């Protein structure tokens, strides 16, 4: 509902935005960007992005590969260099890079309306599915059948996170100082409970300082928009982003909606490194801070998000719905899910529409790349923390936090270990890490196996 409302509001403002937002077609007309073929119609582009949204399973790597196939290989709507520059730019941004890449491609082809259409079509199919699954989970999650299915899903999710850890580490830890950044990040979040935003800022500052100066080749054309246009774009989208939160503060009777709007707005600014990285911070706040969900429910939500199309960060919608449902039932749950979607994805349009004209310029700024690389190294430590946090809460029924001065350590009760989860996790590790089975297949097999074990025991 929130996304539909956003579409209607934006359509009403398109004429206003057109004054301040320069489309990709306008940039090309000025000769500031590389040429690329244009789709025959807006309908063709919308159909292509709808196909991407419906088939975008398997996480960002698979989603980006699908977009490359459709946008570059099949239709030649973007050149290889344009696609890679846009991907590098989206990797610099907080939020789901695949959704932002789709938004950029739509913007480049058909301006603001194209960007909105592409971004919404990427998100809406998965958002609808997640909402339906969250409703089923809220009403029937305590049934033995559902509990058995999620026994296997939790074990599979644990190995999926470990697999993500290996992949990010292989890409990010290319020098000793990045290993150091990862280690400091892990100690900071696991033993000192430092907030994730602080870790991101510290890593970005370190990477910015150790990087070299900008390249002074003079080969990069300046952006095709003025600073005034960019500032106006930022202002418009900040108003669109923040207006619902202001209204909630003024009129909402349920404090949970205000808390959700503020928390997930903050989360949208620091979601560097993908959903896995920010899950640790989100779990820390949602489980221990607000008390909206239990640790097991966080695992269940991630498992559901892994099996649906769209960005993995849609797990936030699951969290928002359950938070609202737990306080005020279905109506408040739906409202909370809408608020969560709004403040999670509206910022993505802000980043793209404000920053897209600067992509070629940014690709030649090594300090920005250095900051991103250091953040990615820190993400390795954060995902390691997430892996241990998930493992302890999935395998052990009882965990105690022991405080040693400024340090805090989670101490499990080894007698409370669930051997069924251990067996399922080992099986998932073999299939996913050794034989490289697909994530949806492993999740479905783990769910069926979990149900069987739960029934037998």
List where the protein language model places each region.
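Conserved beta-loop-alpha segment that forms the PLP phosphate-binding cup at the N-terminus of a helix
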Residues: 100
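Intrinsic low-complexity, disordered N-terminal segments enriched in polar/charged/small residues
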Residues: 3-5
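Multi-pass membrane proteins that catalyze or facilitate reactions on polyprenyl-/lipid-phosphate substrates
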Residues: 11-93, 104-308, 312-457
